[in-house]
């Protein structure tokens, strides 16, 4: 059974997060909702409130097989600013563990340089954050250990 950590911040796109979490749990994955905000209560970009299972500081990201970054604004910017999360992403990438990002969230990986030389996609308007990437308009693309998705319709 895969262990997935979904990283959450206020202003995330609810469907991108919760649809993915729902499908993964139905498939038998152990999914933990991890807040990077210091609070378990998360408010999505459409003012839907829900609870994270854990705070970032209460978890060990190295225990996860998959790190998942939902999109949405300003949630993506909050994820991008979290140094602990960026360190966990770098470590996971070096270890070849799976990383998935949807909508605006691939911009985090792009700005970290993790997508250079890869094929990736993102929400239209964020392509400039994917420097050194072979950009595609495909809905979902996996290149090596990293999967990126264009947006809500591909959750």
Tell what function each PLM region has.
Residues 3-6, 12, 23-39, 52-155:
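Active-site-adjacent pocket-lining segments in enzyme domains
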Residues 47:
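Conserved phosphate/oxyanion-binding catalytic-loop motifs
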């Amino acid at each position: 059974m895969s262990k997935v950590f979904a990283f959450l911040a206020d202003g995330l796109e609810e469907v991108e997060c919760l649809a993915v979490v729902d499908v993964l749990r139905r498939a038998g994955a152990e999914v933990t909702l991890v807040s990077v905000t210091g609070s378990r209560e998360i408010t999505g970009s459409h003012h839907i409130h829900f609870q994270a299972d854990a705070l970032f500081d209460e978890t060990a990201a190295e225990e996860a097989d998959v790190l998942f970054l939902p999109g949405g604004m300003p949630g993506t910017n909050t994820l991008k600013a979290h140094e602990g999360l960026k360190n966990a992403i770098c470590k996971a990438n070096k270890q070849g563990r799976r990383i998935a990002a949807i909508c605006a969230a691939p911009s985090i990986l792009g700005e970290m340089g993790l997508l250079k030389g890869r094929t990736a996609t993102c929400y239209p308007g964020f392509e400039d954050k994917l420097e050194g990437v072979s950009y595609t308009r495909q809905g979902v693309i996996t290149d090596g250990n990293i999967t990126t998705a264009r947006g809500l319709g591909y959750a």
